[in-house]
Amino acid sequence: MSLQFAKYHGLGNDFILVDNRESGEPRLTPEQAVQVCDRNFGVGADGVIFALPGSGDSDYVMRIFNSDGSEPEMCGNGIRCLAKFLSELDGGAQSRYRIATGAGLIVPTLTETGLVTVDMGPAYLKPVEIPTTLTGTGDRVVEADLEVGDRPWKVTTVSMGNPHCITFVEDVAAVPLAEIGPLFEHHPVFPQRTNTEFVEVVRPDYLKMRVWERGAGATLACGTGACATLVAAVLTGRSDRQATVELPGGPLQIEWREDGHLFMTGPAVKVFSGSMELAA
């Protein structure tokens, strides 16, 4: 089996994009996606994204397999890459797409500057929506106590259609991400596991973040994580509603509008196109 693909990245968060418009099911199995994502024996990527035919009021459907074969609901950097990929496939005929994801309908728009702005929809804050068994004040978990790795942490939980646990630190560079990240991801208070963001507030309009992604580990960027980070920073009084979130791969501009929707603006870059032989 020969797989035709294009590789894109959003701030170093890299993906294999597959034109899957002829079928409503991904061309690869989760096991094959693991093979493709392997950085030694495959192409190498944080995940494989499939552009499937639209349904209902969507132009396309987005499916993703992480590098471990798991399937997340959505990916912010990935959907920017998908928008650029779709624009290439249709010859630039569209600049705005309505894409159905496991987190709902997401609308990316290609800007004249080459960046992609995405209406990420609203954040969800109720514990059952994360989901988490943590209890908080009212209908949200803000600065809750959680012991991870034999030390206490203050955590805020946010769902962008996928689960996020945000904790604020003095020095984000000093966080032992490879050690503590898996402990957060698999903590029993998160029945569907979680993405975890470690955040340093430089200014109310400038946040530095590192992320441990559920199913992918440490990555250079996470779009939904940047959105969840801004929400947590606003809820805890640390940030304005519009801020730059600096990730290891570069900055994203995030805005939490008064109507509740979050908008993310950032790059998506094509690296190359190619083919790979896979066992049938």
Swiss-Prot record:
Ribosomal protein: present as a keyword of the record?
no
- Pathway where it operates: Amino-acid biosynthesis; L-lysine biosynthesis via DAP pathway; DL-2,6-diaminopimelate from LL-2,6-diaminopimelate: step 1/1
Q: Would you tell me the protein name for this molecule?
A: Diaminopimelate epimerase
What's the gene? dapF
Q: What is its EC number?
A: 5.1.1.7
An example Gene Ontology CC term for this record:
cytosol
Return the NCBIfam families for the record.
Answer: DapF
What Gene Ontology terms for biological process does this UniProt record contain? lysine biosynthetic process via diaminopimelate
Keyword tags: Amino-acid biosynthesis, Cytoplasm, Isomerase, Lysine biosynthesis
